[in-house]
Amino acid sequence: RDFCLSRGLGDVYKRQDESFADLRAIRERYPDMKIVLDAATTFGCPFDGVVTTEQVVAYLEKAREAGITAVDLCDTIGIANPLQVERLAGVVLEKFPEIRFGIHIHDTRNMGIVNTLTAIRSGITRVSTTCGGMGGCPFAPGASGNTSSEDLVFMLDQMGIDTGVSFEKLLETARFLKENVPANYSGHQMNIAPKQCVMG
């Protein structure tokens, strides 16, 4: 089973070197554990501002040295744009072929689905999403949740890309959540009335 561990690119809560020392200790104690490292604020930080490609590469080099083989590139505050995603994905996929990359995009500025699609078309095949786009970010007030699971699966289905995931079940889950769990939702499909806005 994968264990997901989030570490930011900056030094706001803990110095990066300390974070990677902790990570190496976890790796040494649990050598068989599959760790997915969430590289928080990859595309921009609410505290440090712009994050450069060079900073991301340096961070990933430390992750590789710590024995990490799976990393999610996280747009924690929903600031990324498709060109930025495409360029960064191209660089890291070339420089770190031994790392399995995923993408984790927040939909704060309504660019979650296009940024996620850009990552997929750039060669990233694992994505983080949430039903209904539910969620937010505790240190970025106003940030939306991740790209909506059902919105993304609907789009990929329409494009002929098989995800192996049921759009109908995701939609049912998203509507249930919205009715029963007070939260911030950025999804669109769950707001369409049944049998409306359809073809045929």
Predicted regions and their residues:
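Single conserved hydrophobic/aromatic residue that forms the stacking wall/gate
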Residues: 1-13
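Catalytic cores and adjacent flexible loops of soluble metabolic enzymes
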Residues: 11-200
